[in-house]
Structure formats: C-alpha cells, structure tokens
A protein has these predicted regions:
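Membrane-proximal periplasmic segments of bacterial cell-envelope enzymes
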Residues: 1-227, 231-247, 252, 296-297, ...
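Beta-lactam-recognizing serine transpeptidase/beta-lactamase-like catalytic domain environment
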Residues: 28-31, 238-253, 264, 290-340, ...
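Short, solvent-exposed cationic patches
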Residues: 45-66, 275, 325-343
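A generic structural signal for short coil/turn motifs at secondary-structure boundaries
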Residues: 46-49, 284, 606-611
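Solvent-exposed, polar/charged alpha-helical surfaces in well-ordered, non-transmembrane soluble domains
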Residues: 49-60, 159, 163, 188, ...
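Conserved, well-ordered alpha-helix/loop/beta-strand core segments that scaffold catalytic motifs
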Residues: 146, 245-291, 296
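Short, gly/Ser/Thr-rich active-site loops of penicillin-recognizing serine hydrolases
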Residues: 507, 615-633
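A short acidic/glycine-rich loop-to-helix N-cap element
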Residues: 603-621
C-alpha cells in the first residue's frame, strides 16, 4: 500500500514531547516526563453493542475515578443499553409530529432523555457507573479522534491493555508526556502552560491554531512563553499506519520540539522571589500604614543587550491573620504605576534638549503656586538654590516645575494664572518615548499594556508630568527606561529568548540554530555632555537620598521616587483612597553597567495621621542589588 492509497481512518498521528526550556546557564527549567496512557480509537465497523461490552470489560481491569460522570452521561448510557424500553416513552402523537417534520429527531432524543427516571438509574451499581463513564470517554468528541481513557496508568493496567490489544478492539497504550518544572513554582507563571489531552486547543485559540494545521485535540501552548514560542517548542508528530491486526507501522518518526534557552538566571530569579516574599510579608506584619500595600515588583536587566535576568512580582493576601503570598509577575506587563520622581532623568533631558537649562543652571527650590490650585512643593523643604546635578540628587520638584514652565514658554508669578500650550505635553512625551516610557516594549510575551496617557492639558498637569505624577507606565516600560539611560541612551529591546537549539530526541542539546542578538530599537537624541550630566546626577543620588538602596554594590547610580497615588479600596472600579507609592531605578557599576534594576512598591503608605512610610522598597532594592552583584560576579 502506498501512502496515497491509505484511507484517512487508517492513519493517525501522536503527540510528541515539546522542546525543553533552559536558563542562560543551561540549567534545565522545563522538561517532559513520560506518562503511561490508555486510549481508545474507534474503528468504523465497531457497533454500539461492542462498545458497551468493551466499556464493561475495561471497567473490570482499570481503576478509574468516575466522579465526573454527569447525570446526562448516565442517562445516555441507559438509553443505548435499553433502546426498546426508552423508545416506548415516545407517544404516537409525537411520532406523528416527527413524520410531519414539526419536531426533529433531536427533539425526540431530548424527550427520551427527560423521561428516563431517577428510579431507573438507581438500578445501576458502581461497576455500571464506571462502565458508563468509560463509554462516555470512548465517545467524547469526534469519532475518529483518539480518546484518552486514563493517564498515569499503573504498570499492571498498561501491561494488560498492551497484551490484549487485539481483543480490546480499539484500546491501546502509549507513553504520553507532561511538563515537569524542575524549579517548582519559580518563574512558573511566565514559563506558561500547555493544554491537556482532554482540553486540546482552547476555544478562544481555535481559529488561530486550526489555521496553522493543528487538530482540535492537539496539546498547545496557551499562555506566556509556552504560547509565545509554540512554533519552536512543539514537536513534530509521529505518523503511524493502523494495520488489520491492530498493530502499527511507523510512517514517520516523531521528534521533540526545539530546546530554547532563556535570558533568565534561575538562581537569581529564585533569590529575587524569596527576597520579595520575605520583605512583603515583613512589611505587612510589622510596618505601620501599610493598609493598602499588597506587593512589589522587581525587574533586573542587562542594559547593553536588553536581556532580562530576573523579573518577579509578588502579592500578599491577609486572611484571618494568615499571610499568603501569590505570584503576580504578569502585573509587570499589564499593571501601570504612577512612577513619581524616578522619571526625572527623562525630565532633565527635556530641559537640556529644548535649551531652557544647561550644565550648572541654578534655580531656587521653592513652592510653586498657580491661581485656584494648591501650592506644589518638593518633598524636602528648604533646599535653597540647586544646580542640575543637585536637583536630581535631592529630587527637587521645584526645579522640574520651573523647567517645565520654561519649556512651555509660560510667564509665571506666584499665585498667578498659568497657561501652557498642548505642544509642551507632546515635547515631554516625545523625549519620554525615546527612553521607552509611554509605549509598549514589545517584549517577547503575548500580553502587554501601554499604561495611561492623560487627556487633560491643564497647566498644572504639565508640572505633574515633569515629576512623574500624570502619565502612568508599566514596570517593564520603567525597566526599559533605566536600561536605556544606563546604556548611554541606547534603547535595546527587552527580551527573554537567548538561543534556539536544533530539534533532537537526545538528552544532549542540539546545535544552536539561532542566537538572539541585541536589537537596538531607538536612541535618546541628546548631546553626550548632557547624558553624562544626568548620569552624574544619578550617581549623586546614591550619596544622598538613595544611599544604601543598592546595598554594597560598587559605584552605583540610581534614582528614588515617591509618588502620590490612588487605590480602589472596595473593588468598584473607582479609585477612592489616596496613597503613597515608592520606586527605585538604578544600575551598577556606573562606569560600565553590568545590570539595571527596577523596584516598585505601589500604595506603600496610607495614613491621615502619620508620615511614616515602610522602608520595604529600599530593603528589597538593597538585598536584590547585593544578590545580583554576588551572582554576576
């Protein structure tokens, strides 16, 4: 028989294990483990009577949890076992209506099902119910598909089916696979998930995968990296010819999918997640004013390549005095934050680029008051006259307000009216975009949001924008910003894939077929002398407000941030509680950055009576920085 002569129902394909996933140091993160599986594939000539007999035979031989057997399934089993009896439940009038096509055969079947009584079903014992469940599994989905009857079969069950394939008429065994996570829950959310044999292609992804040649019962990546790199990770199916004696002839061998190597350092990732868990719980248990604080975010990058070395977010839920920590890493991609003063490096760039400030420009740090609005001040009072570097070192809001008014060409006097053109907002946003703030990073994950772009052009909002109190950005955008600043204005695309290896069935990895090179996606259009000035400001921060934020890492540079934020306290979709959020961005060593760090702690303070703010953000940042330096060294 040539392949062209073989009927479709004589050929079938089996799922092949997916490619493995490794970290940057070739530590195996995700592997496949063999699972003994019993399945059923109906032959065209098999009658319903034979199927029922097979179901009872298998009920005697395999241990199967049938608790998922629905009442409808049991009624269907009763119907096929008692056709004559159930047929009598249909009246002559109903049969006449069917002949007249006033009702359908489907309506008749529904009437039959409705009229099967609980008393009739009560005659079924445990074995009957088990057989009913097996019969249901045998007939679930399309008749020509393989139906999984049992996974994780015992050695005895596996051997029995294997030895009695001929008489079991459609039942067979195979070694299926499941994903095995060698580091437990560490980074597991972002590694993603794969559909099961039972679920096959999820409904919402059906059109996409069917258009790519998949079958409905194929196992596919359904989230994050498993979904993003489905085309690489999926294996090539083995194809078999079903012989008359129920044996198989191999037409084409299957092969495991491509192994992929990630940019993540799993040992660093593990440490970051542990530090987050410890510090978040400690803050909730022991720090005042943390009513609405429930977690923090961390991202570590290599600024010269865009490689993500670690990324984690944890969320704590307090229930009856018990602290339960959950993974919240997707929030790094989808939950915008109010950044606060960490944007001031980008804000200084606007001032330099437009020529309204220069190296050494001094301004008095004082409250700014626009008519009919509250005074806007720096967090620290009495800073006096500051130049551009000290304005960053001491996080002067007034310096940014006055710079913004100059950018807008506005005439300001205390408590007077202030008018600014819409173009001033766009001047800021254009420069912020060069750093990656306000645009998707296009990181290689399937979900990402933009953040919020304010729609009002009131003059006070321009001043807010200059200190990070207007537009909001996702944590990955903020990571892109500090990475760009650390890389001297070169913006590299953030990414998680490092290498792709050739498909193989061996334990040993195949040769590298693709190396992911750093992708330069933009540059900050600013003279080098001004870039150097901002870097000097960031270095000065670490000797003042940011002291200790990067632990004992040598030659750090960074920027602290405090933001006025809001929280939805009752889950009604409206933000109703004013809070304070904390942020820190940095890199080290400043003269040759090996890593950049982003740490964000939204809603870290809430109080109407106390100014106390939990040090959780600085504690996380300090511990993580030390750990990064220790591991990278």
């Amino acid at each position: 028989k040539s392949l062209d002569d073989i009927k479709v129902d004589e050929v079938y394909s089996t799922s092949t294990p997916r490619g493995r996933i490794f970290d940057r140091n070739y530590n195996l993160l995700v592997d496949n483990v063999g699972v003994k599986t019993i399945y059923y594939k109906r032959k065209p000539e098999t009658s319903t009577k034979t199927q029922i007999e097979l179901a009872y035979k298998m009920a005697d031989k395999i241990d199967l949890d049938y608790s998922k057997l629905a009442k409808t399934n049991l009624k269907e089993f009763y119907l096929v076992n008692n056709k004559d009896k159930v047929n009598k439940k249909i009246t002559e009038k109903e049969r006449e209506l069917l002949k007249q096509r006033k009702i359908t055969i489907s309506d008749i079947n529904n009437l039959k099902m409705e009229r099967i009584t609980d008393e009739e079903l009560s005659n079924y014992d445990e074995k009957d119910k088990k057989a009913a469940y097996i019969y249901y599994l045998m007939n679930k989905g399309y008749y020509y598909d393989e139906k999984i009857i049992k996974t994780y079969a015992s050695n005895e069950e596996f051997a029995y089916v294997s030895e009695h394939v001929k008489e079991l008429n459609g039942f067979n065994v195979k070694l299926e696979w499941e994903r095995k996570y060698l580091y437990g829950d560490t980074f597991k959310t972002i590694l993603g998930s794969v559909s099961t044999n039972e679920s096959g292609i999820p409904f919402e992804l059906k059109d996409k995968y069917l258009s790519e040649g998949y079958s409905l019962n194929d196992r596919v990546g359904v989230s994050y990296l498993e979904y993003q790199y489905e085309s690489l990770l999926k294996g090539d199916k083995a194809t078999y010819l079903l012989n008359d004696d129920n044996s198989y002839t191999v037409i084409k061998d299957g092969i495991r999918g491509n192994d992929i190597v990630l940019t993540i350092d799993i040992n660093l990732q593990k440490e970051v997640e542990q530090i987050l868990t410890e510090e978040i719980v400690n803050a909730k248990m022991n720090n005042a004013n943390t009513t609405y604080y429930n977690g923090s975010h961390v991202i570590i990058t290599d600024p010269k390549t865009g490689e993500i070395l670690a990324m984690a977010s944890k969320q704590v839920v307090v229930n009856n005095g018990e602290y339960k920590v959950y993974d919240n890493t997707p929030a790094l991609l989808t939950n915008p934050v109010t950044p606060g003063s960490i944007v001031k490096g980008a804000s200084m760039s606007v001032g330099y680029k437009t020529g309204v400030i220069d190296i050494g420009t001094k301004m008095l740090d004082e409250c700014v008051k626009i008519r009919n609005t509250p005074a806007k001040c720096s967090w620290t009072k009495g800073l006096g006259y500051l130049d551009d570097v000290k304005a960053l070192a001491y996080s002067s809001n007034a310096y940014q307000y006055k710079t913004a008014m100059k950018v807008a060409g506005a005439n300001y006097y205390y408590n007077g009216p202030l008018t600014v053109p819409e173009s001033a907002f766009e001047t800021y946003r254009k420069v912020f975009l060069e750093y990656g703030l306000g645009e998707k990073t296009n990181i290689d994950l399937p979900v990402e949001s933009y953040g919020y772009k304010g729609t009002s052009y009131e003059s006070g909002h321009l001043l807010d924008m200059a200190i990070g109190q207007y537009d909001t950005y996702t944590p990955v955008q903020i990571a892109s910003y500090i990475s760009t600043l650390a890389a001297n204005g070169n913006k590299y695309k953030l990414h998680l894939l490092k290498e792709v290896h050739e498909k193989t069935n061996n334990e040993k990895m195949g040769k590298v077929v693709r190396n992911i090179e750093p992708e330069l996606i933009g540059t900050v259009d600013l003279e080098q002398k001004y870039k150097d000035r901002i870097k000097l400001g960031f270095e000065s921060v670490m000797k003042s407000l940011g002291y200790g934020y990067m632990g004992t890492v040598p030659s750090p540079a960074g920027k602290t941030g405090t933001a006025e934020s809001f929280y939805d306290s009752d889950g009604d979709g409206k933000i109703d509680v004013p809070t304070i959020s904390k942020g820190f961005i940095g890199y080290a060593p400043s003269y040759d950055p090996k890593f950049a760090i982003t740490v964000l702690s939204p809603n870290v303070r809430y109080s109407t009576t106390s100014e106390y703010t939990s040090p959780v953000n600085s504690k996380i940042s300090s511990r993580v920085s030390n750990k990064v330096f220790e591991i990278l060294k």
